[in-house]
UniProtKB/Swiss-Prot annotation:
<feature type="region of interest" description="SBD1">
    <location>
        <begin position="274"/>
        <end position="343"/>
    </location>
</feature>
<feature type="binding site">
    <location>
        <position position="203"/>
    </location>
    <ligand>
        <name>ATP</name>
    </ligand>
</feature>
<dbReference type="InterPro" id="IPR042099">
    <property type="entry name" value="ANL_N_sf"/>
</dbReference>
<feature type="binding site">
    <location>
        <position position="348"/>
    </location>
    <ligand>
        <name>ATP</name>
    </ligand>
</feature>
<feature type="binding site">
    <location>
        <begin position="440"/>
        <end position="443"/>
    </location>
    <ligand>
        <name>ATP</name>
    </ligand>
</feature>
<comment type="function">
    <text>Involved in the biosynthesis of aromatic piperamides natural products such as piperine (1-piperoyl-piperidine), the pungent principle contributing, together with several terpenoids, to the aromatic properties of black pepper fruits, and displaying numerous pharmacological activities such as antiproliferative, antitumor, antiangiogenesis, antioxidant, antidiabetic, antiobesity, cardioprotective, antimicrobial, antiaging, and immunomodulatory effects. Acts as a carboxylate--CoA ligase that catalyzes exclusively the formation of piperoyl--CoA from piperic acid and CoA.</text>
</comment>
<dbReference type="GO" id="GO:0005524">
    <property type="term" value="F:ATP binding"/>
</dbReference>
<dbReference type="InterPro" id="IPR000873">
    <property type="entry name" value="AMP-dep_synth/lig_dom"/>
</dbReference>
<feature type="binding site">
    <location>
        <position position="204"/>
    </location>
    <ligand>
        <name>ATP</name>
    </ligand>
</feature>
<feature type="binding site">
    <location>
        <position position="343"/>
    </location>
    <ligand>
        <name>ATP</name>
    </ligand>
</feature>
<dbReference type="GO" id="GO:0004467">
    <property type="term" value="F:long-chain fatty acid-CoA ligase activity"/>
</dbReference>
<feature type="region of interest" description="SBD2">
    <location>
        <begin position="344"/>
        <end position="407"/>
    </location>
</feature>
<feature type="binding site">
    <location>
        <position position="206"/>
    </location>
    <ligand>
        <name>ATP</name>
    </ligand>
</feature>
<dbReference type="Pfam" id="PF13193">
    <property type="entry name" value="AMP-binding_C"/>
</dbReference>
<feature type="binding site">
    <location>
        <position position="272"/>
    </location>
    <ligand>
        <name>CoA</name>
    </ligand>
</feature>
<comment type="subunit">
    <text>Monomer.</text>
</comment>
<dbReference type="InterPro" id="IPR025110">
    <property type="entry name" value="AMP-bd_C"/>
</dbReference>
Amino acid sequence: MEKSGYGNDGIYRSLRPPVLFPNDPNLSVTSYLFQRSDAYPDRLALADANSGETLNFAQFKAMVQRVSHGLSRLGIKKGDVVLIFSPNSIYFPVCFLAIVALGAVVTTGNPQYTSAEITKQANDSKPKLVITVPQLWDKVNHLGLPAVFLGSKISGDGTIAPSNRNINGTVTYFSNLVELGGHVSEFPPVSIKRSDIAALLYSSGTSGTSKGVILTHRNLISTACMTTSDQEFDGEDPNVFLCFLPMSHVFGLVIICYSQLMRGNSVVSVEKFDLEMVLRSVGKYRVTYLCVVPPVMIALAKQNWGKIYDLSSLKRIICGSAPLGKEVIEECAKNYPHVPIIQGYGLTESCGIASLEIPEGVREYGSSGILFPAVEAKIVHVENLTPLPPNQLGEIWIRGPNMMQGYLNNPQATKLTIDEQGWVHTGDLGYFNGEGRLSVVDRIKELIKCKGFQVAPAELEGLLLSHQEILDAVVIPYPDAEAGEVPIAYVVRALSSTLDEEAVKKFIAEQVAPFKRLRKVTFVNSVPKSASGKILRRELIAKVRSKI
């Protein structure tokens, strides 16, 4: 094997030390976490920066046990799907672990989703129960599902939660759910195998329809072992992670919450991103690891916040979701010289991880680091599919124990993404250098990455074409300093139409989450297409960028 990790078989292998994975076939996500935590019952597990509430590991375990029994008494059983549609709180991971302890399956919804978006996901995943908050109830009430409301009967903004006359179905408040669970000291007796499904996390596809990524207990346990391996090899003391990234997303739920709690680290929950609250919380809770997305890095680069807030506890800033510009990294390094900035690469289909930089040694701008232990990769020629050696650009394929089992109810998409040898075809273009560092340079997929979220152009195009005065439309990414990319549209109007830009923007804004809203609309006579009718999206992107 070369210094790059490249072998004669065309496969790149991890240069990190190997990880020992648990081999008990009957291990669940929940049992694995708590069999380890019994050694440190008094250590802080979860803190809520918004409410000030805290749970040590003993309290955390007891609450998960009670909630799992409570859910069982509500009729949730092995194989059932439960939707968590809520902002971040310490009760999000409690509910997640309680659900999977029953052998049931968690699916999550971004709180920014519209009613139509969450309905599509519910129609696909068919949940038996929704766990939400009063402020989001109007978006899911029509589903007619029994619900659990997190928090007290007074909602977070001081208003009374919806009364029964507004509720279509049965609502149980979280405090009542805990009481329903009773005073128990064991988890419900359910037979769970590592091969059982634990989570359905939705990932946008280029088809414009969001797809349920099937992740097993083995996937999540393996990911946790891999994610925390650097801390273990370096012999680090227990760390404190701040989680303001949505727990509805693989980064927040699996990489931060589950993986770090599994190691015995503490997780501080922030309901939603507010830079000054995040920075205050770093000092208050002595946060050592800060996980961010590029827009937050840009905010950190603009000002030396360390002069205003106590950031002395920080040991690492980890940035995922999209590559960072050289200027942003340099400014952050200048502002926070004691904190290495670590970039990584992953996707929902790989439980959020594939590669990560190592803080020590020479840094390379734009690199996403080296492969995690047990992850293999290929760089494949996009036309003839032959494996490529270092410093040659091709599609990134990855394989490992963290890779999804497929897409829910979508065998065709599964077959296109995972081949018979278990390789996940990422749709991303990249290359490894001679030292085994991966650089991701473009996406074959046409997803737009806006503020760390995925936006499918085809979804927005479908909505545009549903307007009776729009004949044709194309949506492309446009570079943005704050968001990374934003969606913009080129629209062909009907001859008699008087539509203007604001009307089109409003039409879309009323139907989608804020991060999917169009930032610009340009009216054109035609959309560039190939002879077969396929939109020539890349040509349009290149043309637009040449004018920037």
